[in-house]
């Protein structure tokens, strides 16, 4: 929050998703110390705290992640049909009140599942391979018209990546860039004990841009940086 409050001229804030752990909707049976109601309370307070440190005129956006979508998907392995009305966080207190302050983007791998702000395209993310940031950047650039000089931002992999240019080959650059903001969650969760989390991290992607699309034929009309939360 201190990092956010120190930023000047913020007009848009985008949460890239997985606001909830959604352990109640996991297909892997387990017992947790917290309940789904606890998650709603924590998420509501967390999003409200973000709004409290940014200018009142800021546009607040939330892109649903796969964990969030698990609570709303019609999948009987996760949530029985008879319970879905009460697990839909958009209609369940204490979270639904806070949700009204945010503009929501669904979890879909198509144009409806991303948010476009000027030359920037944002989504939660879907794949986790080492080159998935670049591959999804190319996919979403195609989905959104293929205009040059755009920046793609996502999360999902939990691995922060600074602004990086896409390449056809090592010697042939493409006119698109990507970055990854990592995760806001735990960096060494128990369920990852047998896997490598050394590249995991929390970060904030900060972008200064010209939003007018008529400027895109002049080249890159944005500057971006990644603020690592451990810095």
Give the role of each language-model region.
Residues 77-136, 183:
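Active-site-proximal loop/helix segment associated with metal-binding centers of metalloenzymes
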Residues 12, 59, 120-121, 151-153:
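Structural motif
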Residues 126-227:
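Conserved beta-sheet core of the metallophosphoesterase superfamily
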Residues 5-9, 54-56, 114-117, 141-148, ...:
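Flexible, charged surface loops at secondary-structure boundaries
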Residues 1-98:
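Core catalytic region of metal-dependent phosphoesterases/phosphodiesterases
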Residues 10, 102, 219-221:
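A broad structural signal for short, well-ordered beta-strand segments within beta-sheet-rich domains
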Residues 64-77, 112-127, 163-173:
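A short, terminal or domain-edge coil/loop segment
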């Amino acid at each position: 929050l201190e990092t956010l409050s120190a930023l000047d001229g913020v007009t848009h804030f985008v949460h890239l998703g997985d606001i909830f752990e959604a352990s109640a909707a996991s297909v892997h049976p387990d017992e947790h110390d917290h309940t789904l109601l606890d998650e709603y309370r924590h998420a509501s307070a967390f999003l409200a705290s973000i709004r409290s440190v940014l200018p009142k005129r800021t546009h607040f956006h939330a892109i649903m992640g796969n964990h969030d979508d698990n609570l709303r998907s019609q999948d009987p392995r996760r949530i029985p049909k008879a319970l879905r009305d009460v697990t839909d966080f958009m209609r369940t207190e204490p979270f639904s009140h806070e949700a009204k302050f945010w503009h929501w983007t669904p979890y879909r791998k198509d144009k409806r599942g991303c948010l476009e702000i000027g030359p920037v395209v944002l989504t939660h993310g879907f794949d986790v391979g080492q080159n998935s940031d670049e591959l999804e950047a190319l996919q979403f650039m195609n989905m959104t018209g293929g205009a040059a000089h755009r920046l793609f931002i996502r999360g999902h992999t939990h691995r922060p990546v600074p602004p990086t240019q896409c390449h056809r080959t090592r010697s042939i650059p493409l006119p698109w860039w990507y970055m990854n903001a990592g995760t806001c969650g735990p960096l060494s969760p128990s369920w990852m004990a047998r896997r490598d989390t050394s590249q995991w991290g929390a970060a904030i992607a900060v972008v200064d841009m010209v939003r007018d699309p008529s400027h895109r034929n002049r080249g890159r009309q944005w500057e971006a940086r990644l603020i690592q939360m451990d810095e």
